[in-house]
Amino acid sequence: MSDTATPLAPSGVFSVPGKDGDPSLREWLALLKPRVISLVVFTGAAGMAVAPRWPSIPIGLITILCICIGAGAAGAINMWYDRDIDAIMKRTVVRPIPDGRMPEQAALVYGVVLSVLSVIVLWLATNALAADILAFSIFFYSVIYTMWLKRSTPQNIVIGGAAGAFPPMIGWAATMNSMAVLPVAMFAIVFLWTPPHFWSLSLYACKDYGKAGIPMLPVVKGARHTRWQILIYTFILTAVSLVPSFVHEVGLTYTVVTSLLDLGFILCAFRVLMDKQDAEGVSLTKDKPARFAFRYSLVYLFLLFCGLLVDRVLIG
């Protein structure tokens, strides 16, 4: 399998009108990657909710909307740039651009316009700090991750994970116009959660990534190395997840909930490591442990932030 990235197709290769004429609302929404932004919006709302001072309902809703639109806009730019590799991978071939339901130029303009609007509206409604973090997160995902890291290094997910970790800081900043230990800890949790989450996916989608020339860790370093990295990053994540407890930002509820979730994640990582493998470390069970770990990681992050919200409510 190749460890080099597939070059971007020349402009115009995928410039085709929608199969049934103009793109429908469904196609425009699909460009925003709704499944991805749902978790982003949740963590952003959590960052806002755990702040000492709650925003007014209108400001809170505008903040959540701007995070949603900003994240979706970055996703649209990502789909525009990745249209060549999306057309190769089974998991992404049905996306609007490679499937011929969306002209590529329209997707790019759509992403850029929504990016600018989300930042301007958030700045006008809240403050410059929140808008600046949102703008940087969009730039980080659209340019640094999508246009550089994704196709150039197996550490793409490790570094690129920062893009999806900013929303808690945005939510907090929109409310407080400042930064503190807790939102930074929330950023670190999401940042360190990203590698084991996506590497679990990449284990069972390895052939797809290799076919597209994306240097994901299993493609470049092999499945066995990836399994060890999942375990290592899971241990680091579980340690960092308890930082809010160590600095006395949370109470017993968060500590207990997170400790139980951490134990579950560690067990998942060990199962991935001990999966039945051939001589090259390729799973003989169709990567069932990795598939379970991927699903568990989603539940983990959701319940951890829920535990944080409940804890902050209980301690006032």
From Swiss-Prot:
One Gene Ontology cellular component: plasma membrane
Localization, UniProt: Cell inner membrane
Gene3D superfamilies according to UniProt: UbiA prenyltransferase
Main subcellular location: membrane
Any one of the GO BP annotations: heme O biosynthetic process
EC number: 2.5.1.141
Residues annotated as transmembrane: 28-48, 57-77, 106-126, 129-149, 156-176, 179-199, 230-250, 254-274, 296-316
Membrane topology: Multi-pass membrane protein
Catalytic function, reaction form: heme b + (2E,6E)-farnesyl diphosphate + H2O = Fe(II)-heme o + diphosphate
Stored HAMAP family: CyoE_CtaB
Other comment: Carbon 2 of the heme B porphyrin ring is defined according to the Fischer nomenclature.
Protein's UniProt name: Protoheme IX farnesyltransferase
Organism: Gluconobacter oxydans (strain 621H)
